[in-house]
């Protein structure tokens, strides 16, 4: 099964107890966040007026910078796909601060009377998942956004810098920042070529490009896993080692900082930097396939 998933799976859409209110939210690999936002523009909000995206925007007073989607932590079924195999994953839902989840009141009766009367949020959620699945399945070129991915990871390096500064170590993240900059530049080059390729479709070129794109996040995994948890192979995100639900970016480095091990932090930064460059090479392979 693992070999089949690595060879063929393009994404995993996770839906786990996510319809208990009226406020749209989601979490995903950064490469899939733009896909979720675009899907939200295509589905009517269950309470309206307008689309899910438009209601989301109004809730944030029109500030698109606040239309954030979270990063995946743990405690759900995406872990096997995302943390273990490096398959991009994401999920959406409609929630509310009701405190019912995983309680004795989490029942059909509560949901039908209070959580989602008429099951309107459930219907909108199913429509959103259908839009995402259709766009992933039918796209000439897989709709990953690696410009968004690289940009977000560059921003998250600041968390490493803060942790290193608190420890007063001389360990530098500059090599990782440079590698992520090269990655993002390669993603921008791919985006330019992608637009031209979609204007003149070529199925053989698209197949080669898609095969390369599927390797990008897989190349950010390590077969031997994290030092603390061998099953967790992804080096981009994991669940927090001290909180199974929270997310931890760059877990191999962050855990070394938490455990006060500067030599391991430096070694893990070098390993992560090399893997980012390997992921960039996959982007360059996709670009070359489309030229």
Question: Where do the model's predicted regions map?
Answer:
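Secretory-pathway/membrane protein signature
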Residues: 1-291
């Amino acid at each position: 099964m693992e070999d089949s998933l690595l060879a063929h799976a393009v994404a995993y859409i996770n839906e786990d107890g996510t319809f208990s209110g009226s406020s749209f939210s989601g979490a995903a690999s950064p490469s899939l966040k733009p896909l979720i936002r675009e899907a939200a523009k295509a589905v009517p909000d269950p309470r309206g007026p307008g689309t899910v995206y438009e209601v989301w925007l109004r809730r944030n007073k029109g500030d698109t910078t606040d239309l954030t989607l979270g990063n995946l932590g743990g405690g759900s079924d995406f872990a096997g796909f995302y943390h273990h195999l490096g398959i991009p994953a994401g999920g959406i839902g409609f929630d509310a601060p009701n405190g019912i989840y995983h309680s004795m009141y989490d029942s059909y009766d509560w949901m039908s009377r209070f959580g989602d009367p008429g099951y309107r949020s459930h219907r909108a959620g199913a429509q959103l998942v259908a839009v995402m699945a259709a766009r992933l399945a039918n796209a000439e070129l897989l709709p990953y956004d690696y410009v968004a991915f690289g940009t977000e990871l560059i921003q998250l390096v600041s968390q490493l810098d803060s942790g290193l500064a608190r420890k007063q170590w001389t360990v530098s993240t500059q090599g990782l920042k440079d590698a992520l900059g090269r990655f993002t530049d390669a993603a921008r080059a791919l985006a330019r070529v992608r637009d031209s390729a979609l204007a003149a479709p070529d199925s053989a070129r698209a197949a080669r490009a898609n095969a390369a794109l599927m390797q990008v996040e897989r190349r950010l995994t390590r077969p031997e896993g994290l030092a603390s948890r061998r099953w967790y192979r992804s080096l981009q995100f994991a669940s927090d080692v001290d909180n199974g639900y929270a997310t931890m970016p760059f877990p191999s480095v962050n855990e070394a900082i938490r455990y006060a091990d500067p030599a391991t932090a430096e070694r893990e930064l070098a390993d992560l930097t090399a893997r980012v460059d390997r992921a960039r090479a996959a982007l360059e392979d996709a670009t070359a396939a489309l030229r």
